[in-house]
């Protein structure tokens, strides 16, 4: 077998059996290998940002990495924004990037670039293969690094001649999935701090948000009479009736400061200290008080489940039902005009059981999370890196990883345009995704940001930079042109009708919601 074939077989040995791909000339031997090894599901994406975002969504649902296949430095550069988001979400990805043949790089052909330099800011591990005999070993190392807890981005650069020359044997992947044990003295100190603090809080993220762990944290919180909070943006959170009602720290700086000011001690489990998303004139970057006592109890690489068992024993937690479990509370479907509040009520009423909600609703959806707390049990995925164009690609990956679950993609119209090519992949793969485009025909979030940075009377030129009118986007035409059936709605009644249709039918469907 050649080098590319040895890499594909190694990926399959390591349970990496999906490749989100946008190949070019340098990757043709890898593409050819896909004919021979049909267990690898290769999914074509028309833009590299769709491929990298899809790999992110896949990992969030399956907890195992997919691979990407990108073309040289410019192709990698096109995928950087969603690799950034994936890194912030701690998603594991085997990111394969084609390169010129080793002896061609020195010729400085038009597409020659510093691929390692481009990859490094969004990767935990970067390596260029130097021999076709080594590519399988390098591939096994990439898989191992991508699977380091909680998940890492491993970029493997594949020169053309290492793909076409005779390769070595496929390699087995030797994983090290051991989690770090939280020291007993740190747990003991936390017990004391929780008892002595006047107003403690538990801040959770990552693996602490897994349903079993969050349930145990809620029992601990009940015992010591303190609240649990989480970040505004989380990679994955299972919520809804029968699950813990997670309360997020507000996105808006003033609201976050107000919420957090009362807590003198914050126990951090799998999360990071609260900071503002941006810097603003005369507003704090750190959202807590200067004298807040932080106890970093467990990081994402720690055995959070084991730590919680020890902490529960030392606090004396009974096997009680936490009082923060959400009760089933389906809102009544409203009538009349469409606005953010009525949209949230429709979502709360109609989200099906075990659905996956990918939230890039931006300003329209600020209250959706809370409005769906009593809905049927479902999973919520947020953008952890803030780079827009996240939603539809992540929905692709989630649908591939979890084909038996309905995926709902909540999208702002401006954000969706960054990775609009995602619709074509949804159609080609017949993925079970219902897309809601919230068409406020503007970068509405930036209108608020103008005020936040002190611009009180923006002029015509400034406002034109935030408008998506003249011409207005026609999402129904765009979607149908990509092969996804679509409708436009401007009343709640029509939204309910077509949302029910999209949820009932298998396959992709888009609703343009006029605001």
PLM segments and residue spans:
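Conserved short loop/turn motifs at secondary-structure junctions
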Residues: 205-209, 332, 412-414
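N-terminal alpha/beta PP-like core and its mobile active-site loop of ThDP/TPP-dependent enzymes
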Residues: 1-319, 350, 433-435
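Phosphate/pyrophosphate-binding active-site segments
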Residues: 133, 157, 270-365, 445, ...
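Short acidic loop-to-helix transition motifs that present clustered carboxylates
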Residues: 27, 48-53, 76, 364-366, ...
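Active-site diphosphate/adenylate-binding microenvironment
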Residues: 4-17, 22-25, 30-34, 323-404
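Generic enzyme active-site microenvironment
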Residues: 229, 358, 410-411
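Generic recognition of flexible, low-complexity loop/linker segments
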Residues: 143, 188-191, 216-217, 254-257, ...
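Thiamine diphosphate
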Residues: 96, 104-111, 366-515
